[in-house]
């Protein structure tokens, strides 16, 4: 049986994952307005992934006969003016989400909620990948972003990213 503290934290995390999708759609809009469709694509795929994370958590709760109530999603309140802004904010946000996932894991560990710990293992790994990808993108932008030709090539690289459904099976 899932511990109450674990289930409460997962319910909050569902909202955080939907917020992440909403935030990344805001970044998507920013890059569309800048004419950087590849960067926009990268964040559109990110938004899809975050939505999937929320859905996986909802399914986990439902598979364990726990009720899920959706909460309001807060509007992102960021001032984006430079092409680097969404990248930096994205990395900052991924680090924040990693902390949230670790807090849920800690709650499950304290309660000896092994089922939830096993479920969260995938998310812990996923967050490591998310932070690495965000950091790598920042490094590329720092190297190439000021040169229009290089920015064009980086934008084309990001345009090639496609959505892949999560590997976690419940």
Give residue ranges: language-model regions.
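Iron-associated oxidoreductase/ferritin-like identity signal
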Residues: 1-170
